[in-house]
Amino acid sequence: MYQISSSSKDELKRLVARASRAAEYCSHNLVLVVLEPEVRVSLDKDSQIEDVELINVSKSLSQRLVCLSANERIKRLDVEFEEVAEKCSENSWLTKLDLLFEPSLKADPILLLKWLSKSRPVVAIWPGQIYEKTLVYAEPGSEDYRTYSLQELKDIQVVNACNGVIK
């Protein structure tokens, strides 16, 4: 298994802190962190970055949505997502965002994150990759496949920790 070193974790925290400072001056106080898949898995298993609490959004949100009908899930997704986020400290990073891409919920994950970041700073670990100038989730042809041009995301800070670049 790939292990993320403590020096890499420190560098990641520095990159995110820098992007968070820049996000304070944007219309959305949102930082998306893009990691190599192996690093993301390691981070999820290890789940320890000093002074950072990793929040499993899919787990927390699914516990709130499971007792609702399919239509109620669609209607209440934004409210339930906000309630999950409200319980987070300012040193929390949202991870495991995959449930937000569930086609039956008919949601746009970026719009949900933007909406949430209007009222509070949000750091989220993107569950996909960056290919050229596009943020991607899933594979083409998959029902939950999504792409977002980085040009469209001008008002969001994107940390590409795959090569240490901040957009």
Regions found by a protein language model. Name each.
Residues 32, 91-95, 123:
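Structural motif
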Residues 87-105:
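Conserved P-loop NTPase "ATPase switch" module shared by AAA+ and STAND
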Residues 1-86, 134-149, 156-167:
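Extended, compositionally biased accessory segments flanking or bridging domains
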Residues 28, 89-91, 119:
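A general structural motif
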